[in-house]
Amino acid sequence: KKIFKISGLLALGTFAITGIGLLVYNLRPVDIKSKADELEAYCKTKGYNADYGILVDYERNSLQKRLFVYDFNNDKVVMSSLGGHGSGGNSTVFRADFSNACGSHCSSLGHYRIGRERRMYNRPIMAFELDGLDRTNSNARPRAILINAGVGPLSWGCISLPFTRYAQLSGILEGLPKNVIVWAYD
């Protein structure tokens, strides 16, 4: 019995240390301000919504907040969230592989225009359609890449948020006169 208790404690201790190590992996400071300034300039140049923008920092792992809704007028983050990425390729919870290929189940980098909010495949889950604006994400519509409420850190390429954060995002985007841009970068 003692050997099993000691073995169990050692295993638990190893798991705890490893888990803590994985959670702090890539805990670098987030330079949201400079990325937000770049996104704001892009939005103004292209004629998109210059009030809000969404940044997705795929350099951070999916156990960290990496989706940021930025209010350009007040120069601040108004929402931050965990954000899942695609499970395709060699993606893990800690690192995403990227592809624009149909059927890849990978996330794609680049700028997206947020489209209409709709039900996700006749289920009670809501989602925002995304239009890829760059060569790296031009297949977003054919691939059905969305921002959706979801469970877990991996998706089929969509940007998935916890349900409460999705509801908050929906509230922010509701009634805005122009399309908001998402910029996913690594």
Label for each model-derived stretch:
Residues 1-14:
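N-terminal Sec-pathway targeting helices
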Residues 13-24:
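Hydrophobic alpha-helical membrane-insertion segments, chiefly the h-region
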Residues 22-156, 163-186:
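Cell wall/extracellular polymer interaction/catalysis modules
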